[in-house]
Amino acid sequence: MENKKKKRYGIIAALLLLVLAAGVGTYAWLTAQEHIDNVFTVGRIDAPDKKPDPSKPEQPGDSDNDSHARLFETNWKDGSKMVPGATVAKNPNVGIKAGSDDAYVFIYVKNAIVKPGTSLEKTPYFTLKNTNWKPVEGQVKTNQSDNSGNQYVSGLFMYSKNSAAQSLPAKLTANAQQDVYTDELFTAVTIPSAMNNTDVVETTTDPKQAPTMTVYAYIFGAGQNGTEQGSNADAQNALNQAKIWANDLENSHK
């Protein structure tokens, strides 16, 4: 129940009332018939009106966001073929509408392209585009046996542009006039030269069995401190909630 309370998004502006005990007699008029209305404002993280500009992915483009999505892949082509030694365009990017509240943004990547037990050297991977994104410590896998390096296979990543601390996410600051975007987590998936068709998950009539790399986005409204303390309490709470979300997501797809 506590986690559900933390996850519930809302900005509540509550007026704290200071009640003064007044004497009777000539001072009674000071409190007679007084009342104060407490105004509650519901937070918003709406879908942007436009898809991101493919050439300037932190800016809105010209294409309408008809599907009301918050997660975009402007360069992905359905049915893209995997060729060993080549790359496949895939560029996940998260956006929020003008006038939304600031938010912390996370992306979880699930890689189910090759069969379970396939060696890491045969597993498709990606590298981060820039420092707008960081891996969440202890929550990612690389294609190295010791989990080192920057060729990522799967895991949880956080938006980190100008973050206040190395290990914490940064706010995606909303703009009152235009949609804003995180920039792309990565731009392509590399298909290892060592991979062959017998390594790939066999396609069946069940789409859940198809070779896929699935990207999920988690957007957590800023200002929710939870039980955390300190100047970066809301960032720490967002990170903790994202880890729970990613773990639930991973377990639900096993």
Give names to the regions the model predicted.
Residues 1-7:
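N-terminal leader/signal peptides at the extreme start of proteins
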Residues 7-26:
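Sec-dependent N-terminal signal peptides of Gram-positive bacterial secreted proteins and lipoproteins
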